[in-house]
Curated annotation (Swiss-Prot):
Signal peptide stretch: none
GO BP: any one term: menaquinone biosynthetic process
EC number: 2.1.1.163, 2.1.1.201
The entry's keywords: Menaquinone biosynthesis, Methyltransferase, S-adenosyl-L-methionine, Transferase, Ubiquinone biosynthesis
InterPro entries xrefs: SAM-dependent_MTases_sf (IPR029063), UbiE/COQ5_MeTrFase (IPR004033), UbiE/COQ5_MeTrFase_CS (IPR023576)
PANTHER family: 2-METHOXY-6-POLYPRENYL-1,4-BENZOQUINOL METHYLASE, MITOCHONDRIAL (PTHR43591:SF24), METHYLTRANSFERASE (PTHR43591)
Pathway annotation: Quinol/quinone metabolism; menaquinone biosynthesis; menaquinol from 1,4-dihydroxy-2-naphthoate: step 2/2; Cofactor biosynthesis; ubiquinone biosynthesis
One of the record's GO molecular function terms: demethylmenaquinone methyltransferase activity
Protein name as it appears in the record: Ubiquinone/menaquinone biosynthesis C-methyltransferase UbiE
Protein's job: Methyltransferase required for the conversion of demethylmenaquinol (DMKH2) to menaquinol (MKH2) and the conversion of 2-polyprenyl-6-methoxy-1,4-benzoquinol (DDMQH2) to 2-polyprenyl-3-methyl-6-methoxy-1,4-benzoquinol (DMQH2).
Binding site for S-adenosyl-L-methionine: T74, D95, N123, A124
Length: 251
């Protein structure tokens, strides 16, 4: 019997064995974790805060709800949700990368955000939570780094309660040619140089730019959510489609 050919996937523009990608992505985020928030502000000129604010508003969280902030990294969304759901609610900040979790935990504790937040190291493709557990799941700028996106979306559907809502905030495809050209120039020429200057790591930011280009476009991601079983799926483009917020429900 011949050996089975290993499954392959993309790591930026490179083709790698699927089982290698998680470790390679981990290396990127171990490298950038300490300066992640600074780089977000610098690279997006602070606009990422507006994108995240719109995500929070679209989530419709209420006191007492259970929220999963998946690939939550340094905890920007978790901090907002913690205030909204209150002491009777619960926010779980989950991330596959322990360096990002550590930065997020320290940041939120320094802000006095404790009590209704817990931290879980978890793989989005196989979430370690019971079925029908969360009212809301958000994943912001994390899905493009997942090896098997279909498995991750299915896993999110499983742990959502009936009536629950998934929101995916992710880089996408600009709608207009001029914006695409400007964005490509910025992503591949400017971002790596910023990474080299601020984090001494140009390679990680070159990967991040490539991972954005390899991520499914708006309509493709919408169909992936529908195929997984989500209903009433729609998306909102922001900043000409550089970023899109996809939303779907479990019924």
């Amino acid at each position: 019997m011949s050996e089975e050919t290993p499954k392959s996937t993309h790591f930026g523009y490179k083709t790698v064995e699927a089982e290698q990608k998680a470790d390679m992505v981990a290396g990127v985020f171990h490298s950038v974790a300490a300066k992640y928030d600074i780089m977000n502000d610098v690279m997006s000129f602070g606009i990422h805060r507006m994108w995240k604010r719109f995500t929070i508003e679209s989530a419709g969280a209420r006191p007492g709800m259970k929220v999963l902030d998946l690939a939550g990294g340094t905890g920007d969304l978790t901090a907002k949700f913690s205030h909204i759901v209150g002491e009777k609610g619960q926010v779980t900040l989950a991330d596959i990368n322990d360096s990002m979790l550590k930065v997020g935990r320290e940041k939120l504790r320094d802000k006095g955000i404790v009590g209704n937040v817990n931290y879980v190291q978890a793989n989005a493709e196989a979430l370690p939570f019971p079925d029908n557990h969360f009212d809301i799941i958000t994943i912001a700028f994390g899905l493009r780094n997942v090896t098997d996106k279909d498995a991750a979306i299915a896993s999110m559907l499983r742990v959502l309660k009936p009536g629950g809502k998934l929101l995916i905030l992710e880089f996408s495809k600009p709608k207009h040619d001029i914006m695409r050209k400007v964005y490509d120039l910025y992503s591949f020429k400017v971002m790596p140089k910023m990474g080299a200057l601020i984090t001494q790591d140009a390679d990680s930011y070159e990967y991040l730019a490539e991972s954005i280009r390899m991520h499914p476009d708006q309509e493709t991601l919408k169909q992936m959510m529908v195929d997984a079983g989500f209903e009433q799926v729609n998306y909102t483009n922001m900043t000409d489609g550089i970023v899109a917020l996809h939303k779907g429900y479990k019924f």
